[in-house]
């Protein structure tokens, strides 16, 4: 009897100790918020993935799986069997998959070569016009992907080759580029490489700026050839930035839809849209494949960052950087080449888009050939009715078009809501993870917050499309806000985490000693 009492007492004391630990743990706001964020991010990230995984084996009424199985409801593996081994497997899966992988790989190579070379020239040489070029070089990354794709069409398309209206070169100079130049893999790779090159420049250029010049100077004093210094000293230091660029550009290019769509390249994204409702289950499998690529990239990122080498300069970093001398002619010539390149990728798109809005018809550049400004028109802007005006396809001008203004209003609503929600959640993730750096739960929350960035955008959209349909919020602003928030949380969380890592813990501890509430500490100190 006495032994039973002692066992019960031990159990009660153990439970009391556990409760006290829980109270102590969750008395800290960052721990309670971290738990809530983990549950929220798990639901918002994993639940749509589960929904789309179930959609791959669900029978869709009116789809091919329902037709060939004779079922109107339930589950079937027909979609998997038909997509991987069916008569159209090559067209629906293997060719788009190969094109997607090749597009992602070549875009990575192009972005790193172009952006990395520009970063080296700006930070480590005496090239002229550095400030101007640094500012204009990031323009393609600021602009949407489809803008460069449309500019490529407006420059190189021709009625004889592509069957569309003549582009600028064909209309003015009679130059008609071959089909492989106008459509397909090559232009898609070029456009995405130019679009993501600023991303490589930002990451790699930051390493070049902060790199200790003493390391290269020591190798120079030892008589090491400059090429060997670059290969054995410089490249290992920028390897983390290059690897980060590869992972992020690969995942972004894998999920690119507008560029392959405009430039007529069949990828997983474009094939998903083409399948539509007739092969809804097989289309969901394509989205699952893209999600698996994102998960694979996350695993590779974790493996590489966990085993990454650390280069530490014990004696401090030199502030003097020895710039490579390109020579009087070389520094001007290199600057001129990049000025021309950045003009075509950063300034010309804006000019051409502005001109296109005043052309009477697409590809009609007669005002340049004839020198007659009267051939231009403002009908695309100023037409206030859609009955007597010809060539407007039943639409009013953009300034009087209710549909355009409604879409603009909806875009602003979604953008503002996504920015506020993603910014707030990302800030809280960065704050809580920085306060629990050694916690496995914090690492899990950080990975859940970052995972949507590594997944193709279309895959995220498809997952929320299926999830929203099952939850009854399909075709609502709420679904758009949820999908946009989850997709852009990684940007906010990573930037917030980087900022929180720079804050000393003593600042908040001093406020805690003064009994300042948590919300005031966040508003007046942390933020």
Residue positions per predicted region:
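Glycine-rich helix-loop "coupling/hinge" segments at transmembrane-helix boundaries
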Residues: 65-69, 157, 255-278, 314-317, ...
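Transmembrane alpha-helical segments of polytopic membrane transport and secretion proteins
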Residues: 1-36, 128, 303-341, 440-442
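Residue-level signal for the nucleotide or nucleotide-sugar donor/cofactor binding architecture
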Residues: 75, 278, 376, 403, ...
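Short helix-to-coil transition segments within interhelical loops
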Residues: 125, 211-238, 265, 436-437, ...
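C-terminal transmembrane helix and the adjacent membrane-cytosol boundary/short C-terminal tail
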Residues: 5, 13-14, 129-130, 198, ...
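Short, membrane-interfacial amphipathic segments enriched in basic
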Residues: 7-23, 68-77, 83-86, 370-374, ...
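Membrane-water interface segments at the C-terminal ends of transmembrane alpha-helices
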Residues: 29-65, 84-208, 237-257, 262, ...
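Short hydrophobic, aromatic-rich alpha-helical segments embedded in or entering the lipid bilayer
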Residues: 70-82, 264-274, 352, 368-386
